From Swiss-Prot:
Family per record: Belongs to the glutamate 5-kinase family.
Protein name: Glutamate 5-kinase
Record-listed ATP binding positions: 17, 176-177, 217-223
InterPro entries xref list: AceGlu_kinase-like_sf, Asp/Glu/Uridylate_kinase, G5K_ProB, Glu/AcGlu_kinase, Glu_5kinase, Glu_5kinase/COase_Synthase, Glutamate_5-kinase_CS, PUA
Job of this protein: Catalyzes the transfer of a phosphate group to glutamate to form L-glutamate 5-phosphate.
Residues binding substrate: 57, 144, 156
Gene from which this protein is expressed: proB
Reaction it catalyzes: L-glutamate + ATP = L-glutamyl 5-phosphate + ADP
Organism from which the protein derives: Mycolicibacterium paratuberculosis (strain ATCC BAA-968 / K-10) (Mycobacterium paratuberculosis)
PROSITE patterns xref list: GLUTAMATE_5_KINASE, PUA
Molecular function terms from GO: ATP binding; glutamate 5-kinase activity; RNA binding
Keywords from the UniProt entry: Amino-acid biosynthesis, ATP-binding, Cytoplasm, Kinase, Nucleotide-binding, Proline biosynthesis, Transferase
SUPFAM superfamilies linked to this entry: Carbamate kinase-like, PUA domain-like
């Protein structure tokens, strides 16, 4: 067993993400029995001493049958209606499954906006931490009834990566109908090569990922992107089939493992890099790009050539090179109107109260 798999096997805390396809029959019907089986595997891991938070998809799928729908809805309003009905069935199923072991579950509904706003981000963290302290099993799902774009992409893959860092988890396990990463879709390509471990970009050379299924929205592209996000933040990831949940959660002997970076990213830098929504963008000249990206220095107004969006001091902004390609993200020290009058000017030309960096090096994260 590699050190990367061993890190997941010995993790004292983890997030387990359960995809929609892991909770439905081949015909697309929500299956509480499948959910109970996954709860058994998760319970075994918790009984061994690991603290587990569950990110569960499946609300929309669970709402299809009660509403008399013939298939997963495609329009947003019906998706949200199905989610509102299905979320009840989903949480009740998790509650019943863990009640067999004397455990209580708590429901936490989040949206991308909740994670992106610093105050809500902190509140979500406190809630999850308190649930764990009270020995309740947190069941996290995207708040589909109010989500817009987020409801259509990701199937909670990205949310699970964000939650893993949010709660300080030592591992993330993604369970779906896919048994790992291949260089192409094994269901369509004969001889598709299985990739057991991803330690760097070279392991992904030539990988062709596909879109999501009809029932879920998170295809291999979403899973791979989310796994890389978590790994870059310092959380090792295991991508495995729900059918192999027992092995995945016991000894991490199945699936594809994504190695984590050696040093875990701080909570603030992670929020700036991945969680926060950029309120605007600053275009930099070549000298400023070198200073920010390669020398890890603060961004001064002199290196800014353009300002876009409407933002305020304390917001996160995207930093772009002359070619408009994003090079970093950071917390800006001025609002849009102030910075528009300061850009391109040296610090010595500015009044004393405007001589702070536009973005301090401590608040910068290269992308």
């Amino acid at each position: 067993m590699t050190a990367h798999r061993d890190a997941i096997r010995t993790a004292r805390s983890m997030v387990v993400k359960v995809g929609t396809n892991a909770l439905t029959t081949p015909a697309g019907v929500f299956d509480a029995g499948r959910l109970a089986g996954l709860a058994d595997a998760i319970e075994a891991r918790m009984k061994a001493g690991t603290d587990v938070v569950i990110v569960s998809s499946g609300a929309i799928a669970a709402g299809i049958e009660p509403l008399g729908l013939s298939r997963r809805p495609r329009d947003l309003a019906t998706k949200q209606a199905a989610a509102s009905v299905g979320q009840v069935a989903l949480v009740n199923s998790w509650s019943a499954a863990f009640a067999r072991y004397g455990r209580t579950v708590g429901q936490v509904l989040l949206s991308a906006h909740d994670i992106s706003m610093r105050a809500q981000h902190t509140n979500a963290q406190r809630t999850l931490d308190r649930l764990r302290a009270l020995h309740a099993v947190a069941i996290v799902n995207e708040n589909d009834t109010v989500a817009t774009n987020e409801i259509r992409f990701g199937d909670n893959d990205r949310l699970s990566a964000l939650v893993a860092h949010l709660v300080g988890a030592e591992a993330l396990v993604l369970l779906s109908d896919i048994d790992g990463l291949y260089d192409s879709d094994p269901r369509k390509t004969k001889g598709a090569k299985f990739i057991p471990e991803v330690t760097g970009a070279e392991d992904l050379a030539g990988v062709v990922a596909g879109p999501g299924s009809d029932l879920g929205t998170g295809g291999m592209t979403s899973k791979m992107s989310s796994a890389l996000l978590a790994a870059d933040a310092g959380v090792p990831v295991l991508l495995a089939a729900a059918a192999d949940a027992a092995s995945a959660l016991t000894d991490a002997s199945v699936g594809t493992v994504f190695a984590a970076r050696p040093v875990r990213m701080s909570a603030r830098r992670f929020w700036v890099r991945y969680a926060a929504e950029a309120a605007g963008a600053l275009t930099l000249d070549e000298g400023a790009v070198r200073a920010v990206v390669h020398q890890r220095r603060s961004l001064l107004p002199a290196g800014i050539t353009a300002v876009s969006g409407r933002f305020y001091a304390g917001d996160v902004v995207e930093l772009r090179g002359p070619d408009a390609v994003p090079v970093a993200r950071g917390v800006v020290a001025y609002d849009t109107t102030e910075l528009a009058t300061m850009m391109g000017r040296s610090t010595s030309e500015l009044p004393g109260e405007l001589r702070r960096p536009a973005v301090h090096a401590d608040d910068l994260v290269a992308v």
